[in-house]
């Protein structure tokens, strides 16, 4: 299986919420912060053939980055990562974690319908995150001045 760029971006985002992740069979990925106060869910293009428990998601993403076009083969206890064209013969076997040591949402949370809806593109979010990091701001406040969200 080849992961789309969108799925890799979802995994990178989820790594900022929690370093570990359980991907269940199917095309839905969910994560929850260790404090259990942030939950995220995404539908991805790929359908995962089996449950995969990853203890360190950033480490796993780093392993993927070792390959130009990584192909994932899901085994019983590991995922084998190879190059798409297979010419180099390089491969990496990444062992699954024990799911019992990984923080994962056990059930879906039914959220009320949104009160406010807006679009925040990745360029603006990156700029806001970088600015907040530079001044050490732990939170981000969005205000509506009826014209723009700032």
Q: Residue ranges of each PLM-predicted region?
A:
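Charge-dense, extended regions
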Residues: 99-101
